[in-house]
Amino acid sequence: MSVLIIDGGIPLKGKVTAQGCKNSALAILAAAALCEDRVYLTNVPDIGDVKTMMSILRSLGYKVTWGSGLTIKPGVIKNYDLTHTGAGSIRGSLLFLGALLGRLGKVVLPMPGGCNIGTRPIDLHLKGLSLMGASLDIQGGNIVGEAPSGLKGAYVYLDFPSVGATENIMIAGALASGETTIENAAQDQQVVELGKFLMACGVKIHGLGTKVIRIKGKKEIGGVTFRISGDSIEAGTYAIAAAATRGSITVDGVDVTFLRPLLFKLQEAGIEVVVTNGHEVTVLPSPRPKGITIKTMPFPGFPTDLQPLMMSLLATAEGRSVITETVYDGRMGHVSELWKMGANIEVEGNTAIITGVEKLTGAPVVANNLRAGAALVVAGLSAEGRSVVYGMEHVMRGYSNIHQKLRALDAKVELVSDEEAVNIA
C-alpha cells in the first residue's frame, strides 16, 4: 500500500503539463486489438491502468513495448479467454468485448472492476452488442460472448449516454459489416479521441462529438501512429488544487473544450481563470471561494470524475454549496474522510450539502477509489497541518507521478510505503 504524507497550507504555484488522457488511452489500447499492423502511440500516461491493458494485450499474443512511445505489434492471437489476465481489476477491460467479438467472434471476460463508486451496470454494452449479432451471457462471474457469423451493423439507441457503451459499440462497429448508428451517444473526450484513432486507422465515422455517431465497418484495419491528447480530468485536478490552496498554476497541453464545465463553475465560485490559445489554463490567486451548486451530468455537463475534488474545494467555501451526483449512485465515499478533516457535509441520497468552514485540518484518511483519493490529496494540500493519505495505489491508477508533479508546484509531499508511514506520520 502506498501512502502520501502532505504538509498542507502551502499555495501551489508553477506550471504543469497534462499527461496523456487516461480514459482515451484505455479505449485506444482496446481498439488496437482490431489492428492487423503495428500501432505506435505517443503521450501515453505512465499509470497502473495502462499497464494492466498492456498486460491483457500481451496475453492475447501482441508484442507490446514501451520506449519513447508505446508500440503494439500484432502476432497470432492465441487467446480469447481473459479470465486470468487481470482484466477483472479495471473497468476499461470491458472494451475488449467489442474488440474481440469483432476480431475473433468470441470472448470470455471477467466482470469488470475499477473504482468502488456504486452500481455501474453493463446492460447498455450487452444490449448494443446483441443488436449487432452477438450472443452474450453471464456465467460464473464472467461475460461469455460469441458472434459466429460476425458482427453486423445495427441501429443502437442508448437509454443513457454511457461513455463505455458508446466506446464498445464504436470498436465493435469498426469491424462489423455495414453501418452502425449510435443514437444518444456520449460526447466525452475519450469517445471523440477513440473515434479519431479509428478514423486514423481508416474507419469512416460521421457525427463524432455529437449525439448521433455513424460507423462504417471495414473487413480489415491497419496500423497507425497516433498521439493521445492531454487529460482534462488530470488538468482539472491541478486547477482545483490551485484554487483550494489559494495558489496559481498554469496547466498546458489540454483541449480546453473539455474543461469548460469545470472552468465555468470555478469562475462562478469566484476563482479567476485565464484561458490561452485553447490549450492552456491559468488559475490565479483568488480569495476564499463562494458556495455554488453543482449537478454532475454527461458531457457537456459537469464531469462526475471531478465531483469529489470540487467537494474538497467547496468544503472551505463561504456559505453553502450543494452537489448532486446523477451519473453514479455511490460516489459519496469520500465524504466520511473529509469529515475527519473538519468538513461540514450532510449527505441525502446522492446529494451533498456543504456548509463551508474556515479551514480543514490535516488528518489520516483513506482513499477507497481513484477520484476520491485525488480529492483527499487536494483536501490535504489545502488543510492546516499534516495529512496522511492511505491507499494511494488507487490514485496512481490514474495519475502519473502525482507526488513529483506536486513537489514541482511547491507542495510538501512524500510518497512512502505504509510501513514507512508509521515512522514518519
UniProtKB/Swiss-Prot annotation:
GO MF: UDP-N-acetylglucosamine 1-carboxyvinyltransferase activity
Subcellular locations according to the entry: Cytoplasm
Major place of residence: cytoplasm
Keyword Nucleus among UniProt keywords: no
Modified residues (2-(S-cysteinyl)pyruvic acid O-phosphothioketal): C115
GO BP terms in the entry: cell division; cell wall organization; peptidoglycan biosynthetic process; regulation of cell shape; UDP-N-acetylgalactosamine biosynthetic process
Annotated metabolic or biological route of this protein: Cell wall biogenesis; peptidoglycan biosynthesis
InterPro entries xref list: Enolpyruvate_Tfrase_dom, Enolpyruvate_Tfrase_sf, MurA_subfamily, RNA3'P_cycl/enolpyr_Trfase_a/b, UDP_GlcNAc_COvinyl_MurA
Keywords of the record: Cell cycle, Cell division, Cell shape, Cell wall biogenesis/degradation, Cytoplasm, Peptidoglycan synthesis, Pyruvate, Transferase
Residues that hold phosphoenolpyruvate according to the record: K22, N23
One of the record's GO cellular component terms: cytoplasm
Binding site for UDP-N-acetyl-alpha-D-glucosamine: R91, R120, P121, I122, D123, L124, D305, V327
Statement: the UniProt record of this protein carries the keyword Transferase: yes
HAMAP family linked to this entry: MurA
Purpose of the protein: Cell wall formation. Adds enolpyruvyl to UDP-N-acetylglucosamine.
PANTHER family: UDP-N-ACETYLGLUCOSAMINE 1-CARBOXYVINYLTRANSFERASE (PTHR43783:SF1)
Full protein name: UDP-N-acetylglucosamine 1-carboxyvinyltransferase
